[in-house]
Amino acid sequence: MIEEQITDFSNSIFQAAFKQYFQELGIIVSDWEDLFKQMNKDKETIAFIRYNNNNDCIGFIQVKSTIFSDDFFKEPYGFIRELWVNKKYRLCGHGAALMKLAEEYFYKNGIYKSILTTSTAPEFYKKLGYEFSFGCKAKNNDPVYIKQLKLIES
C-alpha cells in the first residue's frame, strides 16, 4: 500500500478517484480539466491518496488550512474538505487511516483543531473523536464537527 501527499491535482490516480467520488454523489461536471485547474490554483489545499501497487486508488482525503478570526481572536483550523474511500475497500480502516494522515499533517503544521461537515457519516467521525458544533454553521447547511487534536504517537 502506498500513501502519497499531493499538491498537484493533475495526478492521474487522484483524478480518477475524484471523478468516481463525484459520480457516486451524482454530481455532473461538464469540464473536468477546468475543475482540476481550479483545484491547482488553491495553494492551501492538499490531498493524501492511498493506493495499491496496481495504482488502484483505495481512497483520498483533501484538506485545507483555514483561519477563524475576528478583531480579537485568531485560530487556525484544519478543514477536511473531502474524504472518499473506494467501495471495494470500505469498512477496512482506510478512512480512519486517511483521517490520521490529515490530522498528523495539521498537528505538525501548528494546527490543533480540525473541522468538517457531514450529512452522510456522522457516526464515523464521532468514533474518531469529532464532536457536533452547536454554534458553527456551514454554508452548505450540513452539520459541523470539530476535534481538538492531540499529539499522535505512531
What are these regions (language model features)?
Residues 1-34, 47, 51, 154:
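Short amphipathic alpha-helix that is part of the acyltransferase structural core
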Residues 66-80, 90, 139:
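A conserved beta-turn-beta hairpin within the catalytic core of GNAT-like acetyltransferases
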Residues 56-66, 79, 84:
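Conserved beta-strand in the GNAT
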Residues 45-61:
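Conserved beta-hairpin
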Residues 108, 112, 119-142:
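Conserved active-site alpha-helix within GNAT-family acetyltransferase domains
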Residues 89, 93-101:
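Conserved acetyl-CoA pyrophosphate-binding loop and the N-cap/start of the following alpha-helix
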Residues 37-49, 79:
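A short helix-loop-beta-strand connector motif used in the catalytic cores of GNAT acetyltransferases and
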